[in-house]
UniProtKB/Swiss-Prot annotation:
Superkingdom as given in the UniProt entry: Bacteria
InterPro entries: Cyt_c_assembly, Cyt_c_biogenesis_CcsA, Cyt_c_biogenesis_CcsA/CcmC
Gene giving rise to this polypeptide: ccsA
Protein's recorded name: Cytochrome c biogenesis protein CcsA
Species name: Trichormus variabilis (strain ATCC 29413 / PCC 7937) (Anabaena variabilis)
One MF annotation (Gene Ontology) recorded for this entry: heme binding
Gene Ontology terms: cellular component: plasma membrane-derived thylakoid membrane
Protein purpose: Required during biogenesis of c-type cytochromes (cytochrome c6 and cytochrome f) at the step of heme attachment.
Family: Belongs to the CcmF/CycK/Ccl1/NrfE/CcsA family.
Membrane topology: Multi-pass membrane protein
Length: 351
């Protein structure tokens, strides 16, 4: 089997494996009592990761340069990065729910590259003069890895919003994931429930108070509210989160923060490397090319996210919404500007 045939087989195999893996993760989420299904999902993601890595390696050997010169190659590198970050996030969170959100994205990317792009864009071609530089690997690979990490982190933020149904849940963990009302039989009640509390509750957590009601046979109740709440407050009843759902939400919030914290410095390094390469190739560090502009917008969005988490102490819904918007911004930066068909970075134009 020659390298071209191997690549054709591997790209189709990667799509098939990711499709089956997506189904396994969805079945595992629908029927949590089947741990073998979840284990098979993890194995499928690892197999897909290895298949894509083998495809990229074969293409590297065939073409003689790092396979990031066109849209087809970058899409597969992006899907490889997403599967890699997925495996890291899943191992860190010990939650198979991560795959419910990341696998469809990885599969969609592979499907787009394999089934949508014309065949002439899937063939290795000699590098254009502007890409004949050692900066190709340094700049493009780091940018693609940053996109992968930021996408996965944003997907986990979207998963957090789904788990909490978009409600503003107050988490007791720090920005690096310590603490939280997820043990000792407590459940966290949201604003809107009927609560009865003493006139002067003990103040904790920068103005928030932890209040406990009597045991009613269903476990104690932990209520997080402002310390200035009067002795008895009647609010409109709302649905509470189960301890399991609350614990999962806190885990997703923490893992999302950590993954984005990994992707942001990669994005910073990639932008700096690109500026140096641009000066070497075109005589200017920054030319406000559409790709450069959206890379800066992406950097600002996630810089705001990390600033809100680290400096302002934001957790829960607000940073999750910001990260979810970052998911859209990353896609515009990576693929949207290529659809414009103009600019110094329009190598991926395919219409």
């Amino acid at each position: 089997m020659n390298l071209v045939s191997l690549q054709n087989w591997l790209d189709n195999a990667s799509f098939a494996v990711l499709f089956l893996t997506m189904l396994l993760y969805w079945i595992g989420a629908a029927f949590p009592g089947l741990p073998a299904i979840n284990a098979l999902g993890t194995a499928g993601m690892a197999i897909a990761n290895l298949s894509i890595a083998t495809l990229l390696g074969a293409r590297w050997i065939e073409a003689g340069y790092f396979p990031l010169s066109n849209l087809y190659e970058s899409l597969f590198f992006l899907s490889w990065g997403i599967t890699t970050v997925h495996l890291i996030a899943e191992n860190s969170s010990r939650s198979r729910l991560v795959g419910v959100f990341t696998t469809p994205v990885a599969m969609g990317i592979v499907a787009f590259a394999t089934l949508t792009l014309p065949s002439d864009m899937q063939v290795s071609e000699p590098l254009v003069p502007a890409l004949k530089s050692n900066w190709l690997m340094m700049h493009v690979s780091v940018m693609m890895l940053s996109y992968s990490a930021l996408m996965v982190g944003s997907l986990l933020a979207i998963a957090f919003l789904v788990i909490t149904r978009g409600n503003n849940i107050q988490l007791q963990g720090s920005s690096v994931g310590n603490g939280g009302y997820r043990t000792n039989g407590y459940r966290l009640m949201k604003a809107g429930e009927l609560v009865s509390q003493p006139a002067t509750p003990p103040v904790e957590n920068n103005g928030f108070a932890r209040l406990e009601s009597q045991n009613n046979g269903n476990g104690n109740t932990a209520v997080l509210n402002l310390a200035t709440t009067p002795q008895a407050t009647t609010l409109t009843p709302t649905e509470t989160l189960s301890p399991q759902r609350l614990s999962l939400a806190e885990t997703l919030d923490n893992i999302s923060y950590r993954i984005i914290g990994l992707g942001f410095p990669l994005l910073t390094i990639g932008i700096i490397a690109g500026a140096v390469w641009a000066n070497e190739a075109w005589g200017s560090y920054w030319s406000w090319d559409p790709k450069e502009t959206w890379a800066l917008i992406t950097w600002l969005v996630f810089a705001a996210y990390l600033h809100a988490r680290i400096t302002r102490g934001w957790q829960g819904r607000r940073p999750a919404i910001l990260a979810a918007s970052g998911f859209v911004v990353v896609w515009i930066c990576y693929l949207g500007v290529n659809l414009l068909g103009k600019g110094l970075h329009s190598y991926g134009w395919f219409f």
